[in-house]
Every structure is written in C-alpha cells, then in structure tokens.
Amino acid sequence: YRSAEEYISEHKSMGKIQCLFKTPKKDFVTIKKGRVCLHPWAFISADDKLLFQESNCYNTKPEDHWVFKTLKLPQAKHLKGKALFLSFRRNYWHSLTDDSSLLNLLEATSIDLESFDHIICERPDNVASQQLQEIWNINQNKLVSLTENKHLECEELSFLAGSLSLAYTPILQTREKILSKIKNIQEKPSKRLIASREDATTRRWLNQSECVELLTGRFNFECILPSERNLFEQAEIFNQAEVVVGIHGAALSNILFMRAKTTVIELRYRGQEGNFSSASCYEELSKLVGINHITVLCNGEERPELRGRSIEDANILVDKTELLKIVESCL
C-alpha cells in the first residue's frame, strides 16, 4: 500500500486515522494486527503488505524498498492489547523533537498514555533521556524495545504518520515545559558557547582543538560537552547563550531552548544534502524559535565503513579563517 491511509480506506474495519495537527499534517494511525520491523525498517499490515509512506527511509519507489530485498524477516514477537509506537532510537534530537511532539499532541487530544498496554520505545541510556520520559510520565514497565526484539506484531498498533516537518505548537510546548522547571533564568543571554562532540564516534570535528583555542582566546567562548549534562542543565546553559558554535549533531538540539534573535553557527559537511538527509533539521528548528542560523559548509572525510551513513556522518575539517570571520561578524 502507498500509505496507511490507502490501506485503511480499503479495509475500514482494520483501523482508523485521526488528524492531530493540520499544518504540517500529523496523523495518528491505529491498525489491527499491525507489525513494525527494525531491519529492514517497515510498518506492515495484517494482510502482510508494506505501508510504504510510513516505512520510507531511502527510496522513492515502493518496489525499491529494502523489505523486498530481504529473504526473511526476523521472527515477530506478539504483543497483546494496545501498543503505541513511540521510537526505536536512543537519539536526543528525535526524543526532544519527534517523540515529545507526539506526546504533546496526544495530550492535547486527551489520548491517555495509560490506555496503552505497551509503549514501543527504548529505555533511557542517559540522564537527559530519563528526565524527558519522566516529564511525560512514561511507565517504564510498559516499555518494549524494538532494538532488542527486531520485529513486533501487535494486536493493535498505533503510531504517528504524515509530514516529517517540525510542528510549531507542540515543539514550543516542549520548550516551555522544560524551561518552566528551571529556576533563576537570566534576563539577558550572555554566554558564548562551543558545543563539543568529542565523545562521539561519528561526525567528528577533526580540528576542534585548534578552533576552540582561537575562539576562547579571541572572543571569550566556553567549550562545553552537552552530553555530560542532564536535560535541565543543557536547557539552562543554551538559554543563557547569545552565540553557539557547533557541528551538526545531537548537541544542537538544545537550540530549542535559546532565545529569539540569538545566533547559532552550525558546522556541516558540504556533501550532506538530498531528499533523505537530515541536513536542514537544525535550520528548521532555528526558524521556529526565531534564531539567527548560519550554516558553514566544511570539507571533511567520508566514512565508507558506515555504508549508507558515510556522507551523513562524515568527519569535518573547519576553515579556521572563515570561522573567525563569521564569528566576528556576529558579535
């Protein structure tokens, strides 16, 4: 089927679709005897057919989907009752934007998380992710890992579908919920931050130490490692920033907490682009928050060993002279 909508229109007794947000369109899909598979990524209907639009990652034609190149899917684990698919990623960006937005939309339409017997979502592996789940009172006893189980068949499966674009209202609701828990927020942002990814294994900033030395010495920047801080500490320090410099990656998710008319300088590999790239996600978030967003395209080294992620997760080499000029123009 081209989409869940097409499937349900042909099999009305097998599911329903509820519009949660009109622009960008966000639909809440519920299907009976639905399946979700991790490798290859796929939502599958009760009659054993792919729901292409909801399962599409890297292909423009249904017949090119990886599910049709797979000899056998992993054995499915059966879940009785109602299951909500939230996420299969342990990824700060997706938790803060996609997952939190869905939870806000469900809350706004009075869909109670407690009405689900299972929540398909990974258990937190860091304090920030744990705090996010606590904000929405996610019952840890209901969590089911798709990463561990690979393939789940649900008596009733619900999930979000529609546009991948960020939705203004639920995004800002997440921002306000988190910032409201922080005491003594400064009136005027004053910090100049460099968001480091030195603990990451992909998308590394190859000459970070040289750039940090220049920015801290000339412009009084402070280099931080956001992953070492909890959710509220990350939100607070980004809320205090007038300028943030950082490589494209999870740490920049915290620009959600910055104030309007502040500045983000995103460092990105120049080859990162295309229909199935996340290249513009931080620019989109900055636009919603009202931030001045400057993207610096950099040379770098691709990672062939990462296969489909070789360009998306390439390491970068920043032109120091160009960076200094851009930073100076922002101060």
Task: Report each predicted region and the residues it spans.
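The feature primarily captures lumenal catalytic ectodomains
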Residues: Y1-L331
